[in-house]
Design a protein with these regions (language model features):
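HIT superfamily nucleotide-processing domains
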Residues: 1-133
């Protein structure tokens, strides 16, 4: 604890195991607490690393696994956005993560007027469903 906000979050998610979709020695695939959208996923290293591209095949394998699980549950090619958040060269005080946001719902008046997202699927339920997918 105390290494970084993302590091602390990953450590707590690994400890609780409620929202984990898949995990290995190097990385973890999580349905994040307070997800903005149904079936949102976050891939992060279990130990802080600055760049995704330097972390070996584990992260890529878990990302592939998560996308496969989403496709099995939501249909062969669910619409989604994917962000790779990785440090620029030379920056070491950073921890990579990848966010996957399936586009299953439409923004309506409440979301647009208040900037509040309504997620109709609890992340714990999403994780359980995707673990079985």
């Amino acid at each position: 604890m105390g290494q970084s906000l993302l590091g602390d979050l990953v450590a707590e998610e690994v400890r609780r195991r409620e929202r984990i979709v898949a995990i290995d020695e190097e990385a973890v695939l999580i349905a994040p607490f307070a997800s903005r959208l149904p079936f949102q996923l976050m891939l992060a290293p279990r130990r802080p690393r600055a760049r995704f591209e330097d972390s070996g095949p584990s992260g890529a394998a878990l990302l592939h696994d998560g996308l496969r699980r989403l496709a099995r549950h939501l249909g062969s090619s669910p619409p989604l956005n994917l962000w790779v958040r990785t440090a620029p060269r030379g920056a070491e005080d950073f921890c990579w993560r990848i966010d996957v946001m399936p586009r299953l719902t439409h923004l309506a008046g409440l979301e647009l007027s208040t900037d509040v997202n309504l997620n109709i699927v609890a992340p714990e339920h999403a994780a359980a469903v995707l673990r079985e997918a």
